[in-house]
Amino acid sequence: YTGTIDKNGTLNGDIVIEGGIDPTLDSKHFPDRETFVSAAVENIKLWGIKAIKGNIRPEEKIQPHNAVPKDWLDADVTEDYGAGVHSINYNDNLFSLIIDTSSGRALVVDTVPHLRSIQIDNRMTVVNRGRFSPVVQRKKNNSRITLSGAMRRMQEPIEVVTTMPHPAVGLCADVRETLESEGIPVEGKKVSASDSDAMQILSYESPVLPEILKSLLFRSDNMYAESVQRKLGESIYGDPQREYGEKAVTKIVEQWGINMDNVTLYDGSGLSRTNRMTPLFLASVLRSAALDWQTGDLFPTLLPRCGVDGTVRNLLKGTCLSGNIALKSGSMTGVRCYAGYSPAERPRYSVVLLTNNFHCTYEQLKSSIERLMVGMFESYQDTIDKRQNTP
C-alpha cells in the first residue's frame, strides 16, 4: 500500500497490485489454490486497515495495447484461446456479459467481473424461436465490444463469456467489491502518496513452473504459453514485451546449436500465422530438450500421453501406442500438428508430424495419422513389450 494508516485504521493511500505475468491468478485450472482476492482481502484486514481513502489500482509492465500480438486475427481475440497476456492475468482473462432478454430486447445488465471501462455497442436482436447465436467482436488491444446476432427470449438472464481487454481492471473491481462486502469502504479519492515508500502487504506466489507447464501442455493453453514466453524474455533481458520473449527463445535454441534457417518465431503459442518452422527444427528442439541436463529429466514427463491425457486423449486410443507415446497437439483451420516423444516414459525418438491445407475431414485425417504412427512404431513397441515380459 501507499500512504499511511492512521490510528482509526484508515489508509490514506492506495492498495497497489503489481503483476508478475502469472497466468494462473484465480484460474479455474488451479481450483485448489486460495484465490488471490481472498488472500489480498485477508491480509489487508490483518494490517488493521478498516477503510481506504484512495483506490485499488494495478501496476503493470505490459500495457493493454501490447497484450495481443499484432498479427493475431481479430476474429480470434474474443475467443478463450485468443486471450491476450498482461502483467496481471486474472480469471483466465475471461469475463461474462449478463444479458436480459425477458422484455423482448437484449439488454446487457451486468458484467462479471465489473468492467466500468468497457464500451459495448449492442446490436443484438431477440427472437422467440431459432438458434441462439450471439456474436462478440472486438479489435485487438481495444476495449470496445460489438454484440450482434440473435438471442432467444428467456425469463432468466443469459451469460456470454468472452475475453477481458484489461484483466487488471476486473481484478481491482473484485478486490474492491470483496473489501466493501467485508465492511471496508473504498472511497476512490486521489491521494498524494508516493509509490517509492509503499509497504508490501502480500506476496502471492504462482504454482511451480512444472505445474504451469503441464497444465499448458495438457490443455494447449495459448495464454499460458504467451505468459511463459514473456516471462522468459523478462528473466533473460529484463523486458516482458513479446520481442524479448522471442529473442530469449532464439538464444536458447541457438545455444543448443540448432539451425534456424527458414524458421520464424513470432509468438509463444503458435496462434500467429507468421510462425514458420520445419519438422526437422521441432524434432531438433525436442531432442535437445530431452538431452539437456537442466530439462531432460522433466520436460518429456510434462507432455500428455496419447489415448490417455489432455488434447490427445482420443488419438491412438485402443492401439498399441495408447499411453506409450507423448505428444503436444496444435491446430487451427487447415492445420493439424503433433510433436513429442516415443516411448513416453523413456524417450528414444522425437516425433513430429505437421499437416497443412488438408481437404479431408478431421476424422479422416486422424485415422490416417494413427495408421502412419502405428505402422512406424508398432514393431518397436512389440520389441519393448517382449523385453519387459522376458523372465
Locations of regions flagged by a protein language model:
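Short, Gly/Ser/Thr-enriched beta-strand-loop segments that form substrate-interacting elements
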Residues: 118-139, 162, 199-205, 314-345
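Short, low-complexity Ser/Thr-rich regulatory SLiMs
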Residues: 3-7, 99-101, 138, 341-345
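Small-residue-rich helix-loop
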Residues: 226-391
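Active-site-adjacent loops and short helices of periplasmic peptidoglycan-processing enzymes
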Residues: 1-85, 90-92, 97-98, 142-155, ...
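Extracytoplasmic
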Residues: 10-14, 51-53, 83-85, 92, ...
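A small/polar active-site loop signature that marks catalytic segments
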Residues: 125-298
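A conserved catalytic-loop motif detector
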Residues: 57-116, 121, 275-320
